[in-house]
């Protein structure tokens, strides 16, 4: 945090929070006219739990969750749901760059004992986009094998 430059902060906030707000606003007019819509934002386990050295990313992803809850309250009466999916560590090119020791340390924090698959995240998004999820709004679905468990 102490070594993070302002431009590093600004770039991550612009990419991971400001862009999401702009995209949400851009789709609202059509959804309001249709009196139907699903907005599903991608946050992260880091936004809920934090991660050393990622103050900017954690703030941006936590901001997306807060923004989504506020928007859900604002437009919920129009049959538009707003939710988040918060992946944990998923088996992608990004996690393939981790060392064996880093993966082993992560797996000790994940009760499921494995990294997630991209399909785990995709299925969660597909569910929230479906008609079966019409009464779910303003929530974050954590897809992380139990690495982070929210209270309540």
Model-derived features: where do they sit?
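Substrate-binding pocket helix/loop in short-chain dehydrogenase/reductase
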Residues: 1, 5-13, 95, 106
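Active-site loop immediately N-terminal to the catalytic Tyr-X3-Lys motif
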Residues: 2, 49-55, 77-78, 113, ...
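Active-site helix of classical SDR
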Residues: 24, 60, 68
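Alpha-helical segment proximal to the catalytic Tyr-Lys
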Residues: 29, 73-77, 134
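Residue(s) in the substrate-gating loop at a strand-loop-helix junction
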Residues: 44
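Short C-terminal tail/terminal secondary-structure segment
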Residues: 49-52, 126, 137-152
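A conserved structural motif in NAD(P)-dependent oxidoreductases
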Residues: 110-121, 132
